[in-house]
Amino acid sequence: MDYITEFKQRHLRRAQLKQLSILEEIDRICRKHDIEYWLDGGTLLGAVRHGGFIPWDDDIDIAMTLDDSRRFAEIAPNELRSGLVLQTPETENTREPIMKVRDLNSFYVEGNEDFSLDYSKGLFVDIFPFIPYPNVSRSFCKRYGKAMSKCYSILHHSHQYSWRATFELFYFGAKFLFCKSVWAAAFALRKCDTYISNVLINNGYGIMHRRDCVFPLSTIEFEGKRFAAPADPDAYLSDLYRNYMQVPPKEKQKVHAVFILPDLIEEAEVKK
């Protein structure tokens, strides 16, 4: 085990507990203002399969409807406790089109972090906005959802000036507009009363969930506390991972982050 890997493993649990405290703060605000959220992705998987964090996981994912995420964005800046900040594409020059609640007294580096952009890089909870989807086939969603998300990611990634970069901008720009028009037609011609999922530019795997597997929300235990969860976690996780109860082999049990530092300043010093 190299030094960086050993360092991450040594600090992982402290980072997880700090992220748990961020989730508790989000939960407090949502309860106070009747905002619905639910555990999503690997966090929901961890709750079902492990009763908490997946042992090697280093982030927390939750979801909200787009309307509730907008309400949260209005309320949270004035409600979050000291040391936490709401990060959005409107408040900081981030590379991702999602909201995060960040801890300012920590440092977290992802593999594709962009250090040319000035934005907070502390531990976080991801908040994914969900929208109703048209009643289309899952294969349609996978084909055009993945394509649109990939094009968006490439178009918003840093590029060096070259003939290849210029070609990519034109090619993926045209492909993005085509996929966007296909989706616009689907939204216009089909009802949107059966499925719900991440906004299109975030739906890199082309996933759709039935609304009745999400609502009405339930609760689930995560690290000894109860948080909101989809109505049918089994169906929800099957959409995402298929055989989700199967633990991956040891060589795939890797921390996502390149580097984690849970505390920039020790808490005792902060309180002085």
Please place each PLM-identified region on the residue numbering.
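Conserved catalytic core of two-metal-ion nucleotidyltransferases
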Residues: 3-33, 76-135, 153-160, 164-240, ...
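Aromatic- and glycine-enriched beta-alpha-beta binding-site module
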Residues: 132, 144-146
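Long, hydrophobic, well-ordered secondary-structure blocks that form the structural core
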Residues: 54, 64, 69-74, 78-87
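Short, conserved acidic/polar surface loops in the N-terminal third of protein domains
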Residues: 50, 74-75, 139
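Active-site nucleotide-donor binding segment shared across nucleotidyl transfer reactions
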Residues: 27-60, 64, 69-70
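A short secondary-structure junction signal
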Residues: 136-143
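Tryptophan-centric aromatic hotspots in well-structured domains and transmembrane helices
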Residues: 38, 43, 55-56, 215, ...
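Short, surface-exposed, charged/polar-biased interaction segments
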Residues: 58, 65, 93, 148, ...
